[in-house]
């Protein structure tokens, strides 16, 4: 098979795995406290990343104090903050809404960079931010009839999921501030190791061991650690090495689409017109953000 097609397949599978996290987080939220689930996820994923590092002969990075502090902040925001907020939000939000909101990451990242670093976005990125905002509002404000009895909870849940996406955007922003570039594999391993250290203390206060065992929640955490976290990393970087940055960026459009489809198929959630509108807006935002970055890179070159 052509190397580029293999890259497309790898990137697509990785993004479908990311989309599935909002669905599996629904099961996790029903049976485990958020910090306990987060600590368990990293406890499973960290040794696997270490094994992959040894297999590939990759060493741990040597960082100064400033970069070490930034990496810890990355883990606290992008690893622990993201997972805890996503699981907390899934107690209240529908998986379909959460999937649409998760797809706004490229636009939210551009918005955070604009606000925090004073970057001047291109017209394409501004359009992406507007479309992403419209997509979130479509799911949050114009709730369907099925969501009416829980409208207040749904709005709070959607806001928690959006806060999780902001945490992920902060992770991307902090990574750009590192003086010493860290390769993706040791960075992911570090995020899991530090993430476990950060989340284990609040997890102890949740006393999950006093709760009845929920097989679905434990299975969800195992899936989250193995498939989107470890396998998703391997698939994404294997695929991204075979295609252009713009092509890989476009694959992120599969996150909201796969999340909405899996929510309908596995959780039997009804798909509303507001969610379809939100997906359309988010897909447009992903395309604008991807092509906007591609055009900006060409101009700089």
Residue locations for each model-derived region?
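Transmembrane alpha-helices of multi-pass small-molecule transport proteins
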Residues: 31-81, 108-112, 166-174, 188-207, ...
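Helix-helix packing/entry segments at the starts of transmembrane helices
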Residues: 11, 38-40, 79, 83, ...
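Membrane-interface interhelical linkers
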Residues: 1-16, 46-74, 87, 92, ...
């Amino acid at each position: 098979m052509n190397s580029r097609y293999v890259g497309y397949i790898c990137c697509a599978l990785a993004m479908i795995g990311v989309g599935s996290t909002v669905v599996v987080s629904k099961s996790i939220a029903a049976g485990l406290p958020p910090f306990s689930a987060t600590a368990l996820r990293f406890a499973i994923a960290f040794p696997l990343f270490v094994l992959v590092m040894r297999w590939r002969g990759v060493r741990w990075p040597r960082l100064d104090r400033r970069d070490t502090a930034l990496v810890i902040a990355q883990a606290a925001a992008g690893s622990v903050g993201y997972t805890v907020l996503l699981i907390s939000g899934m107690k209240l939000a529908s998986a379909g809404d959460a999937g649409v909101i998760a797809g706004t990451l490229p636009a939210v990242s551009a918005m955070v960079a604009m606000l925090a670093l004073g970057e001047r976005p291109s017209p394409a990125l501004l359009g992406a931010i507007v479309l992403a905002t419209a997509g979130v509002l479509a799911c949050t404000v114009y709730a369907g009839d099925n969501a009416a009895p829980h409208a207040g909870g749904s709005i709070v849940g959607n806001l928690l999921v959006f806060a999780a996406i902001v945490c992920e955007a902060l992770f991307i922003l902090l990574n750009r501030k590192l003086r010493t570039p860290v390769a993706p594999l040791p960075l992911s391993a570090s995020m899991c190791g530090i993430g476990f250290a950060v989340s284990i203390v609040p997890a102890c206060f949740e006393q999950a061991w006093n709760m009845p065992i929920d097989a679905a929640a434990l299975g969800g955490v195992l899936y989250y650690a193995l498939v989107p976290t470890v396998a998703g990393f391997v698939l994404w970087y294997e695929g991204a090495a075979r295609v252009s940055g713009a092509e890989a960026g476009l694959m992120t459009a599969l996150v909201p689409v796969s999340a909405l489809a899996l929510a309908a198929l596995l959780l039997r959630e009804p798909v509303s017109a507001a969610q379809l509108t939100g997906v359309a807006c988010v897909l447009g935002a992903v395309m604008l953000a991807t092509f906007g970055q591609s055009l900006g890179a060409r101009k700089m070159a």
